[in-house]
Structure formats: C-alpha cells, structure tokens
Amino acid sequence: SVACAVVCAVVFHIQLKKDIECYPTGKIRLIIREELLFFGIFLMWTYLAGFRPQAYGTEKFMDYGFMEAMMRSTTLPARDLWYSEGTINYYYGGQYFAVFLTKLTGSRVEVTYNLMRTFVAAFAFVFPFSIVRQMMKDRLYGRMEGRKKYLPSVAGVTAGVAVSIAGNVHYIVYRCVIPMIQKLKGVEETESYWFPDATRYIGYNPVNESDKTIHEFPCYSFVLGDLHAHVVNVMFVIFLVGLLYAWMKMIR
C-alpha cells in the first residue's frame, strides 16, 4: 500500500510538472472519497470475518491448503496437499491470485487468507458504486439541479449493496414466511434452516432432478470465506464492465 501511494504521488508530480494528464485533476476529491469508502467497507467485512476467522468447515480447509501448497511450490500446478505424488487437479485461480498477493507483500497465508476475503468483498462494493454512479451522472447530465445531484451517489450505494451485501429472499421465504404459514395451518416445523440452503433453490422447490444447480451469490461466499475463482473473479468482471463503459463513452 505504501509503495502504491509513493508511485501515485510520483506520477501525480510528473503530471503537474510536465502538464501530462495522468489523473483527472478535477476528480481528486472523488477519488479520495472512493478510497475512504473502500477502506470503510474493507474494515466492515474484516470485522465480520473476525467472528469466525478459522479455515473451518465446507471448503475453507481446502482453500487454505491450496494456498499453502502454492506458497511452498516453485512450479505450477503445485503438489496436491492430500496426495504428494500428484499435483492439484482442481481449479485454483482464486487461491493463486491470493498467493500472488501474499508473496508480493512478503506476508503469510494465515494473515492474507481472511484479508483476501474482505479485499474482494470491498471491491465488490466500490466497483459497482463507481460505475453506476458515473452512469447515473451521465444520464442526468445537465439536469443535476436540486435533489437530483444526490441521485448518482444513491444509485452507486444501491449498486454496491446489491453486489457486496444483498442476497436473495430465500431465507425470508423459507425460514420466516413458510414456517409462519405452516404454523397457522397447525403444521409443526420439522426441518431446521441451514444457511447454505439459500444457494439451493433452482430445481429444489419444486424439485426438478434434471435442472438442479447451486447459485452461490457474492454475499454468501464472502460470509462463508470462499476463495474459489468464481468469487475472486467478481472484482475482475466488474472492473471489465467499467473498462467497457469507459470505452463506449470514448468512441461515442
């Protein structure tokens, strides 16, 4: 972080000295606000991760083991942590990126495992915030008087919450609404609710054996502590969306 700050300061100095447009000088305040927003969301998710920081349950032990195996290895794929004669034959892109940052910062897996979780979760808030805020601002160009000037920020926060924090309504329906209806009918509750059930609604109710799938929405994976590629890839996909939007604005 310190090195990045130094590089940014040097590039900014070059911009001022040679009049090169490296940074949008009129947007420095916005950049600082978004950095503070990222830091705040990062701290929030770090606090939540602190309630269960252990690599315990579901696939977290495997995630942690993959990272340790890659930390020890000089080649890829790394040695399989369960079968030393073989190599990892499961997708490990998310764990690889976490190990890359771990080695880059000279840190240890026991530190960066949870920080990577919260790092991705924070980006999953700030990236949508920045993109949707800009989209709304472009949409309202020339019509930002009065209360409308707050709409871009409101839209940005809504987008950030939708991606990083919000989930589906499975818990509300299956843990609250349906049990309440059953209770009114005089039917006793026979099943308890397990939070991963929220990812299992396609093909499960009503049952469709030919079309069952598990939909792990971002917030579920952030709470669970998953570092699979489909989780870490969230920030890359949203970053690509931002680049595409910037490119579309440039060619119009």
Where are these regions (language model features)?
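Active-site lumenal/periplasmic loops and adjacent helix-entry segments of GT-C-fold
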Residues: R29-R33, G40-F236
